[in-house]
Amino acid sequence: FGVVVKALAYMLRLGGEGLTRAAEYAVLNANYLKKKLENTLDIPFKNRFCAHEFVASAPEGLRALDIAKALLERGIHAPTIYFPLIVHECLMAEPTETESKQTLDAYVAALEEIVAQGRRDPQSLTQAPVNLPVRRLDETAAARHMVLTEDMG
């Protein structure tokens, strides 16, 4: 329920004109990132217009999971990975309307560095993150031995 109240407050605060502008910025930001990253990531739908998000594939020999974890290591929110399922090693970027050009350019630079590092030494990305409180999880063990709890505190 709380998220609905927050969304309504956001819409009321922006108004019709502000919502239109926010949508335009979200679309502009997604298309800007897609264009800037076309030489770094594989863009499967390169010649199609994207709305507020776009999908890319990790370059040959690199995994989307490793790229996402390396972004977390740099303090950058990772994109959605492995969705949609029809895109191999998928990374789905959804820059919001509030991201500045400087933030988008920093994101591009981080991805360029990560991909370059991965091309030089693919194994170097497989342990990321190493400097965060939570390191790489054993996802296979987590899927096989789930611990579900309602205890949130």
For each of these PLM feature ranges, what is it?
Residues 1-8:
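PLP-dependent aminotransferase class I/II
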Residues 11-153:
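Non-catalytic terminal extensions of PLP-dependent enzymes
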